[in-house]
A protein has these predicted regions:
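A short Gly-Trp-Pro
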Residues: 1-8, 13-128
Length: 128
C-alpha cells in the first residue's frame, strides 16, 4: 500500500506530496541549524516519490557545500535538501505525519540546549 503525505510551506504558496517515505530522522549539524533555526527533522524519500502540486515556480535553491537546499522564495520556508537520489524533506511542513524517528545524525554538533529523547540510534557524524 502506498503511503502519501502532503506538505505546504508557511504561506501556502508551495504544496507537495511525498509517496512511500522511507524514514523520519533528525540532523543536528550546524548547517541544518543555520538553515532552519534548529535541528532539522526530515523525511527521507526517493526523489521520484516527491512531486510539487502547487507553486513549483516559487521554489528557489541555495547551493551549499553539503547539499542543495530548496526553499519557498515567498515566505522562506525550508523545503528539502537534495541528496542526489534522495530528498530530506522538512518534516514540520507535512500534515498527518505519523512516522517515529528512526535516527539522529551529526549528534556531535547538536545545540547544547537540545535534549534528545527516545531510543532512535544516534550517530556522532553519519552512520557507517
Amino acid at each position: 500500500m502506498t503511503e502519501t503525505l502532503n506538505g505546504t510551506c508557511l504561506c501556502g504558496g508551495v504544496e507537495y506530496e511525498v509517496q512511500d517515505p522511507e524514514a523520519l530522522g533528525y540532523c543536528h549539524c550546524t548547517r541544518c541549524q543555520r538553515w532552519t533555526g534548529s535541528s532539522l527533522a526530515g523525511v527521507v524519500v526517493a526523489n521520484e516519490n516527491f512531486r510539487f502540486t502547487k507553486g513549483e515556480d516559487l521554489v528557489k535553491r541555495y547551493e551549499s557545500e553539503f547539499a542543495p537546499r530548496n526553499f519557498c522564495s515567498n515566505c522562506g520556508s525550508s523545503l528539502y535538501d537534495d541528496l542526489g537520489e534522495k530528498y530530506f524533506v522538512a518534516a514540520g511542513l507535512m500534515r498527518d505525519l505519523e512516522l517515529d524517528p528512526s535516527f539522529h545524525l551529526q549528534v556531535a554538533y547538536k545545540a547544547n540546549w537540545h535534549e534528545i529523547g527516545g531510543d532512535a540510534p544516534q550517530f556522532a557524524e553519519n552512520p557507517p
